[in-house]
Every structure is written in structure tokens, then in C-alpha cells.
Amino acid sequence: MAIIKRGARNKTAQEPAKRSAKIKKATYDSGKKKEVGVSDLTLLSTISDEAINENLKKRFTNGTIYTYIGHVLISVNPFRDLGIYTDAVLESYKGKNRLEVPPHVFAIAESMYYNLKAYNENQCVIISGESGAGKTEAAKRIMQYIASASESNSESIGKIKDMVLATNPLLESFGCAKTLRNNNSSRHGKYLEIRFNNQFEPCAGNITNYLLEKQRVVSQIKEERNFHIFYQFTKGASENYRQTFGVQKPEQYIYTSAAGCTSVDTIDDVKDYEDTLKAMQVIGLSQDEQDQIFRMLSSILWVGNISFVENEEGNAQVRDTSVTDFVAYLLQIDSQVLMKALVERTMETSHGMRRGSVYHVPLNIVQATAVRDALAKAIYNNMFDWIVERVNISLQAYPGADKSIGILDIYGFEIFEHNSFEQICINYVNEKLQQIFIQLTLKSEQETYEREQIQWTPIKFFDNKIVCDLIESRRPPGIFAAMNDSVATAHADSDAADQAFSQRLNLFSTNPHFALRSNKFVIKHYAGDVTYDVNGITDKNKDQLQRDLVELIATSSNAFLRTIFPDNVDKDSKRRPPTAGDKIIKSANELVETLSKAQPSYIRTIKPNQTKSPNDYDDQQVLHQVKYLGLKENVRIRRAGFAYRQVFDKFVERFYLLSPSCSYAGDYTWQGETLEAVKLILKEASIPEKEYQVGVSQVFIKTPETLFALEHMRDKYWYNMAARIQRAWRRFLQRRIDSATRIQRAIREKKGGNKYEKLRDEGSKILAARKERRTMSLLGFRAFMGDYLLCNERKSRGAYIKKQAGISDKVVFSIKGEQLQSKFGRSSVRVKKVLILTHSHLYIIGQSMVQNSVQYTTEYKIDVNKIAGVSMTNLQDDWVAINLSNSTQPDPLLHTFFKTELVTQLKKLNGRIQVKIGTVIEYQKKPGKMHKVKSQVSEATPKYNDNYKSGTILVRRGHPANSPQKKKPKKGKGHSKHHSTSTSAPRSSVQSSQPSAPVSRKTKKPAPPPPGSKKLSSSVAQTASRPQPVANSARGAAQPQATPQPAQVTQPQQKKVAPPPPPPPPMQSSEPKYEAAYDFPGSGSPSELPLKKGEVVYITREEPSGWSLAKTLDGSREGWVPTNYVVKHQGGSVPPPPPAPAAVQATQAANVTSTPVSSSQSETATTATPASVAAAQPNFSDGLASALAARANKMRVESDGEDNGNDDDDDDDW
């Protein structure tokens, strides 16, 4: 199946939205033109002819001439250049559907070209409207767009496109003229087919010509002109032509000056003549062919200057024989033979099957003038037909045409003061086009809905078939048939034929669309009533050249003249030659048949005034056109109907890619009925049922937006498939790289050990068995990773802090901690800080709330080379003082869980640093003033933390100072085989226990938790998501955390085991109870706990920022609440908490790092309630992260409790 790629969309100047953004930021487009009225008449609130007219008037006044009725384009002639056909405008419509851009003729052309490629169906555009409404201009713009859109590097293709465009100036020159209503009125009809090859490049073309108005060659209405070419030639002819063909100015010729208009302000005849010559060259007309064309034009002009006078017998004779002599020279015939053919008529009698006598009948002046004009009309008409055929020969030079786009540019509906045979032919063709529009857009559409059993409310409309039958019908005879009968009855006498035709018109008196007047008749066309003159109408219908003129031309030595005239008519043939009426009926029906084989587009043109003024808008005239074009009915049917319909097979063939059930890898895989495939496609493409209906054999899409959505999804299918293949390949390559990395790491560790573990061992050496050790420090999983806040990553909290602090160097160590700060009139307090160490400086960064957001600023910037030493106690506390040398700043006293790693990193950067370990910490509280902080063993302190009180650090007894580091445990059996590995940050050999880079990784979906665990785990996630009041954390590594709750552990699917028995009910919490003083609905954040006034909760932690961590009495919900919204509960009956939920396996206990646990650990795990988990001694094999989380939360609860009751200021020396 061919892949159809729609043209690229134009990119805007703004940056693409982030992937996480749902809606792009709105921006003001100052260049966009303000919308006036509605761009689609189906959006009108009131559907009436007056409302349509008013909307068109608003847009015309604003310089907006295009409006839609669904897919039908309404065009109002602006009578001025609006600058809307430039190359830039044309480019903006490429690859766009009509809803993405304003209404324009380019949008219709783009739709046709896209449908040709997408559906491989012939396309055509029917441009209709009255004379002067802008049909020819619309046809030219469609050709301009298609030539530009069908880009090709082929020289032959480019030549065809140039030829197609060149047909415009050539056929305009020979087929258009200035009329009272239009300065460039088409006086013929043409249907141009642009044919395309399999690559949808224009490779051929064909033009069909319809009924040239040859009467204009010899006579025009006052202030009108002959065909443009006569004025171009007489004004712009070269000196060679003037000498050879005797070319004069247009004022010297009767055929160009009789109407009194030889120049038009808006027409440059000389320039247009040059364009015509260029077009002839592009199409391929040789110089000899061009010379012969201009010879014929000269002969026509000079034939018009032949005049007659009466001789003595009252017959006509040529006034000036020099004129006939020059005409004979141009036509290359004998002068005497020419004069005789003009003033005499040859008659031949017959007797049965035998020929009779031949008579030469002299003509009077009127008859001789008619013969002269007939000769001029015949030469021009036959030459025009030859030019069209010659163009077709050039356009057919390149074979391979498969599909086509047809452009119909035909004369518009005409109503003059005197209307004759030409007008009835023109108006008849317009009736046929109106009938096509009715058949395809109104009648056929409603019949299709009824046949397909689609829900539909019928709409009444006028079917003009009765008018078409009145003109073209043979049985019963129509007007053309009656005309032919009259000619056959009295073929020798035109007046008698007119009289016979007038009598036959009585046959139509009962037709409601016909009325008879004296010597005239009225046909009620769809565009209005037109009165036609009977006099002379039958003679124009004969369309036969007098026998004498045919024989005259046959004597010419000019090969071109003989070529453009057909062979002599067989005199013995008894068959009646076809009349002009027969030809126009045949041409019209062939046109209808051609159009019915293509998918039509419609352009309805409207003429706003009769004065050709760019500022006038004649409401009555436009309202009349709105009514006879049937725009109101079109709007009503469009609003009630469906924008697209297609038979099941073609719809499935087009869109089966959108359904995974019907396709795989681009192949059609559905084995069932096509009807079921249609329903699956629409369902799996998420098309609402109200947007389509499924009939008996077709599917109907209601709105064009839905169709465009389907087309867009289909266009994106191939790109999505390519992206999937690319993702799979990249995933494979990354897995291979990660595997190689793991192998390399394992080899390096085998040879030289892990660098992070080496750094840890070096830290143990620095302590030199002088400081008691914590349990967590001795774990085998412990490794000195350094950048725990991930400051070196691109998108992380640490990177944000680093940017705000103005740090540009690479970070070697980062952690959240606390600093002891003295407050005037208060005890020294522990203030949260961020510690960042680079190769040259140690940064102590503070944080503050500014407009509800955390801001980070550098408070201390310490040069590493100016650090003289560090001071620590010999107990297991986490305090360390940074002793500065010759500094005007006080020495900072810091608290951090990773104090040994900080000291090790400082010692590595500056080997001169002295590490002081004793019973006290000595530091400069003020510059030049030493202060000592004592340490004391207290078993009443929190198990995983220490307390600072009145210059003394209270801490439990730790492991002996000479305790050895435990060996790193082996990986568990349940470790994921294909876990993701990030190479962007350093990792230890056991990645599951250490903080890692913030790289999004997809892991296997964990096993579903037992009942009751979901609520508990969600509360932890909610609490951890709020940035302001959450305790210090480094992605869950060795930092204070909220009270741990059972949570899901991201681990491989393991074998199900029988659940343990439920635990006993939880003990009554000893935490203080508070009561909500006000309603707190919350802001919608999952980290907040909404409260109702009077609701009692536990407060587990208070923050200086004004937030408190609360949880409900039953422990099912936990979150942050404003501290000033709750007050101490004064007692009273509080309902007991409900029974504890079902037991949760220990492997699903709180684990903020989602550490995988080995299968052996999982099998020996025990159950625990949230309270018991917090208090339980962590098992070494449970991993560092779980133990750190439990330690941090327990420490925070106990530390806060003691600090709240401490009001003494023993440490204040201010």
C-alpha cells in the first residue's frame, strides 16, 4: 500500500512545549487579521438569504472575499488587487486542511491535490457564477497553486507545468473580451484537465473548448470590445508585421472601432501582447505557425474594412477594390474570385437524382455584408479551434498520465437588453452546471441518506431539470429541437425559418417556466427570467458556411488556411449537418459525463456590483445571486448532513492502520466482515458515536474536523511506527552498553576495588579508632558516593540549589544538614542548611520562604585551603566544627549524618587539615572567642540521633571505636536481571543501596500489595511530595524522614506465599492530640490533609515554616496542615481507632528508595505495624536505606519532643 505523506507544516517561532505540558502557553498573534462575520456560513445563527448577504457584505467591506459553506467556496469579486495571491500566501496553504487556514481558493486547490494523492481519484472544480464574478481569475489561481505544489526536478515535468500556465494568457487573448460587466469576460468555455503520473507530477494536459462567441468578431455592443488579441496585435505588432501584413492602429479597422472603445484603463494591450508571444513560445508554436496566425488576424481585420455600394442594377459591389486586393494577398487567393464570392451566391437546382442548372444570384448590400462577416467569423472560429488543438498536441507530448484534476472555466449567466442565440446557449450550459450542483450536493445527498437508512430530515429545494428539458429535450421536442425543425423546413429563407420557429414556440405555452411574447419568448432560468429575440436566431443556429466561401478558401495557396478549415462537405449526402444547437447539447452532456467521473469541488462566484467598483456593494444584486445560487438551501443541508461518506471497502482500505485489531506492521490482518472492521476502526480511533453513522453500504462522517483527525492519525502512523523501531533499537543498544559497563565495573572492582568503598575505608583510617561508630556507618552497603543532592545533574533539586547559590564548579559532596546558630535572647537553635563542597570551596547555603517558594542563598563560602582543622567528639554523635585559620568569621558548627564522609573529602582536598577528636568540640563561636561543646552519654536520647542542650551533646553509647567495617553482602537471588543502569553518575557495585542519579527508569510492575497496604503507602507518598516543611533528605539516603509507613517495594514478581496471621491491634499513640479550629479544605495537593472544624488528629511534627504534620486517629491518612488552624485537644470522648488493616509483609515496609530485597530476606520477613516498624532494631540485611529511614523518623519525633520543652538559655553568652 502506498504511503501518502502530507506536506510539511510550517513551524512557528515559539519553542515547543515541554513534554509534561498539557496545553501550550497562549500567545497574542499581532499579525493575525481580525475575523469579520463568520468564515463558514454554516455557523450563522440565523439561516436566511438576508443573513447570508449581510455576512458577505461585512467580509467584502473588510477586504475578505472568501467564505465557506462546508467544502463549497463562495468568492466575491473585489475588483482590486488584495495582495492575497503572493508566493508567501501560497506557501502558507501547502499541506494544510481548510480548517487550519482562512478560506481561500488556494485551500480548495490544496484539498483537490491532497485528495488526488490520498484517494487516487480524479478531481475537478466547478466554478460558476454570472459574467464578471471572477470565474477566470479563480481558475488561474488554482492552476498557479497546483503548478507550485507539484514540485519536481524533472525537466519534462517542469516544461508541462510551464505549458499549462502559458495556456492562460494565450486563451485569454483569443477567447476573452471587455464587456459592459467585465473587462476580461470569457467569451468561450473551456475545461482544462491537468493529468498526473504515478508520482502525482503533472505530465500531460487537455483542453476542451465550448462555443466561442464568434459574433463578437464582427460586431459588439456600444462600449464593448472585440477579442483582446485584435487590440494587442494592432498596438504591439512588430515593424516587420506592420510592413508584411499592413497592420494599422485599432482605430483604422471597423471591427475594432465600431463600438467606440479601443482602450481600457486597467488593460495594457502592449504588455499583454508580449505575454501572448511568450506563451506561444512556451507552448511550442513555431515562428512560421505564429506568422500564419497573425496573417489570419490581419486578413480578418481587413475583411471588416471591405464595404459595398449599389451598382446600377441595385446590387452590391465593392466600394474599394484595393481593400479586396490586399485581403486576397493575405489569404493568398485570387482577388477576382474573392470579389465574386462576396457579391454573388451560387444556386444549383436538382431534378430527382439528377443535377440541375447552376445560377449565380447577385446579392444586395445587406446580403453581401452578411457574407463578408461570415467569412471573418469562420476564419477566426476555425483558427481558435486550431490553436486549442495545437495546445493539446503539445500537452500530450509526455505519456504516463493516470489521474487528473479538471478546472472548468466557462462563461457566466448572461441577461442583456437584447438576447439571442449566443445567450440561450450560454445560459443553457449554466443550467446544466446548476443541475450538476443540485444532483451532487442536494438531491443525490438526500437520496443517499434515504437509501442508506441514515437518520435525516428532508429539505426542499428547486430542481432545475425541468428547465434543462425545456431547452434540450428531443421527445417531446425542446427549444433547440423546434429551432432545428424550423431550419429544415425553411432552410433557404432565414425570415421564414424565424417565423416557423415562432409558431412552434406555442407548443411550450403550458410549461410553467416558459412564456411567449410577440416575436420574443421568455425562459425562467434559475438565475432569473431572460427574454430572447426570435429574429435571426435560426440563422445563427445553422452554423454553416456558404458554399461559395468554402470553395473560395479551397482555392487558397496558403496551407495553414486550408488546414484550419474542414474538408469540403459531401454534396450528395442527404444527412442534415449538425446545427450549433446540436453541438452545444452534445458538448454540455459530454461535460456533465466528464465531471461525474471526478470528485467535484465547487466555487460559487458572486459579482457585488455592475460598476466594477471596489467600494460598491449592491445589496439587491447580491441578494438576487444568493437566492438563485441556492446558498440558503446549501447551508441548511450542510448543517444537517455529513461532511464525508465512503463505501466500507474503501474506508477500511484507507484507515485500517488506525486499528490494532485490523492491522499489524502495515498489513491488513482482519479476517471478518468489512462492516465490523469499520466499527473497530472508528472505535479504536476514539471517534464518538455521535460523529458518524453507519449505513447499509457506506459510513458517514458528520464533521470535517473528524475526517481531518482520522487523516492526521493515519499520516502520523508511519512516523509512530518508525519511532517504535528506533526506541527498541536504542533500548537494545543501551542494554548492551549497560551490560558492558557492569562487566567493566566488576573487573575494576575485582582488580582494584570500588573507589567509593575505598574512600569509605580511608575515612575509617582518618578516625583512627578514636570515635565511636554508628550502626549505619559499619554496614557493608555503605559507600561514600559524594553528591547526594545530584547537583551535577541537569534537572534535579540539587542542580536548582546550585544554580540559585551561584555555584559553577563541579560538586564533589552535597548533603542537607543543620548548623547551630545563636539567637539573641534565646537558646542556640539548629537551622537547616545545605552543604555543598567543590574542589575549592565549602558552601553553607540557607533557605527561606519567598512568596510561597523556597529560595536558596549562600551564607558561607569557605576556601578549603583556609580550613585549619575539624573538631569532633569521641562519641557517635553527628556534630563537626570547621576550624578556620585567621578568619574574621565564626567557625561553623554543623550537624550531618555523613560527617565522616565530609571530613574525608576535606582531608582529600587539603591534606594539612587537622582532625581533632576528643571529649569536647572546640570552635570560635565569635571571631577570637573559643567555645567548647561537651559530649555526654545518655540512654534517654533517641536511638538514631543525638540531642543538643545547653552546650552539651547528649547521645547514646555507640559501637566501639575500633569496630571493623562489615563486608559487603552478596546480591540476592531476586535481583532484577535487566535493571536499568545509569552511567551519568557514579554508582557503587551494589546499586540498590545507594542514592543514584535522577534518571527516570521503568521497572517491572510490583506485585499487588495485600489488603490495607494501599492507604498506608499513599499517605507516605503524599507527605513526601510537599517541598516546604519536609525534613532534610538526600533522595532517602541517611536523612530525617517522616514516620515510615508500609509502602510498595519496587521489586521483581516473586512466588506467592501464604499470608502470616494478622497482628494484634495497634497500641494507643502517645502523640499529642489536636483539634481543628477551622475548616481546612486544602489546595488540592496530595501532601495536605483536609480537615473539618472539630476533627481531632495527632500532630507528629511541627515546622518553623508554620506547617504541622498530622495524621488521623486511625492512622489511615497523613499530611500537612497549617499550625494556626489546630489547637490542643482538651479531652473528651474520642472514638477508638478502627481495627488495624490486614498484615503487610515486611518487604513492603517503608522504603523511600524502592530498594530491591533479596528473595531470602523476603521469605524470612516479619510483619509490623507502623509504630513497631519505627521502633524496631533494623536488620543489617534489610539494606541501608530502610534502616536510615527508620532512624531518621524516630530521631525527629524524640528530638522535637525534647526541644519543645526546653526554655532555658544556658548557652547564651550575648
Swiss-Prot record:
Residues 1-21, 926-1090, 1129-1177, 1193-1214 are annotated as: Disordered. SUPFAM superfamilies: P-loop containing nucleoside triphosphate hydrolases (SSF52540), SH3-domain (SSF50044). Residues 1069-1131 form the SH3 domain. GO terms for biological process: actin cortical patch assembly; actin cortical patch localization; actin filament organization; endocytosis; mitotic cytokinesis. Transmembrane segments: none annotated. Residues 404-486 are annotated as: Actin-binding. Residues 981-1000, 1037-1057, 1157-1177 have a biased composition (Low complexity). Keywords: Actin-binding, ATP-binding, Cytoplasm, Cytoskeleton, Hydrolase, Motor protein, Myosin, Nucleotide-binding, Phosphoprotein, Repeat, SH3 domain. It holds the Pfam family Myosin_head. ATP binds at G129, E130, S131, G132, A133, G134, K135, T136. Residues 965-980 have a biased composition (Basic residues). Residues 36-715 form the Myosin motor domain. Residues 771-961 form the TH1 domain. Residues 719-739, 740-765 form the IQ domain. Residues 1058-1067 have a biased composition (Pro residues). GO terms for molecular function: actin filament binding; Arp2/3 complex binding; ATP binding; hydrolase activity; microfilament motor activity. One of its GO terms (cellular component) is prospore membrane. The myosin motor domain displays actin-stimulated ATPase activity and generates a mechanochemical force. PANTHER family: MYOSIN, MYOSIN-3-RELATED. Belongs to the TRAFAC class myosin-kinesin ATPase superfamily. Myosin family. This is Myosin-1.
